[in-house]
């Protein structure tokens, strides 16, 4: 199975594209988008962040690897799924903020993918 890029790698790639979302929020949004029935798109940030002007990640960069690894993990019948959050050794407020960001991203991505469908 493809390994998830680190939160720092995702944040660096995110800044390169000019995205304001945290690594946790991007991963949550991608997971929500895919769980809600959204297509697995190379240009996923534009769909997940509802901004058609966003460029697609370059093939092989951290955001592209995030898409590939997340898709593989969600399809894993052995439930090999990990969240992109703050390190376990990070202070509790930082970890809580990352979990909040992930959940906010998931709900947004799921809502965008599901649209009006229940």
Predicted regions and their residues:
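Domain-length accessory/inserted modules outside core catalytic folds
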Residues: 1-103, 107-118
């Amino acid at each position: 199975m493809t390994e998830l890029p680190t939160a720092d790698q995702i944040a660096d790639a995110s800044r390169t594209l000019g995205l304001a979302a945290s690594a946790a929020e991007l991963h949550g949004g991608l997971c929500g988008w895919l769980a809600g029935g959204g297509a697995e798109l190379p240009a996923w940030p534009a769909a997940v962040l509802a901004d058609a002007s966003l460029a697609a990640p370059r093939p092989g960069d951290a955001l592209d690897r995030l898409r590939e690894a997340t898709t593989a993990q969600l399809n894993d019948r052995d439930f090999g799924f990990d969240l992109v959050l703050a390190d376990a050794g990070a202070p509790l407020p930082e970890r809580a903020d990352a979990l909040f960001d992930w959940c906010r991203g998931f709900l947004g991505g799921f809502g965008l993918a599901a649209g009006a469908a229940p």
